[in-house]
């Protein structure tokens, strides 16, 4: 086992204000503990939430902030009480790096619903030090919140599964929507949505992609394997699809109407919200009453579910569709993501970007 230094200086790319612009930043990692692992970051996916946080869309951002919560790296040191991992293991770190371990969600192993969870960035750890994410050379993480990347899964492919992949896998499992033959829809074809198509198809579902235009039809059906494509602005097609779906996985991260989609659900159908939306959504109650339909939500997934989806993707031969970029391109990547100009997930090659070298003259804390 490697020995742990109490503190260490590392380099990340941080936003310093609500412009969301990232630049090199040198900071001190939190003190390490006996159950901590030190992870050299190899790759980190870019999620739409990174934009929300970096630009303070949710009104709770603290700066400087190093984003990134789809982290894949190599264990380089372990604490004396670490039992799950060893030096050289390739591991993943997701959205959460701490929880209370005492509440009902924690005891049920769905720690993502713990009211005292600690986010992997833009939060404060138990020692009072800010948490910083995976757009950095190194992270220190408690072993409970680390997952081993299975053999057969490339690290850059694994990164989006730590958020986008488990975000669609978790509600399908939690709401009993894993039975082959179900008819489901994925609303929105971005980073989360494209994994939704792949995961649902691998479960044996008939999958419809719903989008606002026809421009993604060929991608959805020819490349991702969707069974049908529905344009939400096509009133005739929407009417023809009424009462046809067991579920809708709604990945749209901006305000949108719900009523057109509720009409597509069968009796007892579920509309599952996954997008982080800061404005109220509205519907009239008969839309759910006259069909015993449910509007519900789901938030990422547990550590156990994340490990499950990683293995599920290996077993089913699933990969995420990614564009790998260097850290120096991260601001352009964030801009493109905000314009929905990516198919379908950016992944930053952190280890290959020499972030330590480019930060020689960077400001520090």
UniProtKB/Swiss-Prot annotation:
State which pathway it belongs to.
Aromatic compound metabolism; phenylpropanoid biosynthesis
Keyword check for Cytoplasm, yes or no.
no
Q: What residue intervals traverse the membrane? A: none
Q: Where does Zn(2+) 2 bind?
A: 100, 103, 106, 114
Q: Name one GO biological process term.
A: lignin biosynthetic process
Cofactor(s) it depends on: Zn(2+)
Note the Pfam families from the entry: ADH_N, ADH_zinc_N
Q: Which residues bind NADP(+)?
A: 49, 167, 188-193, 211-216, 251, 275, 298-300
Q: Which InterPro entries match?
A: ADH-like_C, ADH-like_N, ADH_Zn_CS, CAD-like, GroES-like_sf, NAD(P)-bd_dom_sf, PKS_ER
Quaternary structure note: Homodimer.
Under what name is this protein listed? Probable cinnamyl alcohol dehydrogenase
Q: Which organism is it from?
A: Saccharum officinarum
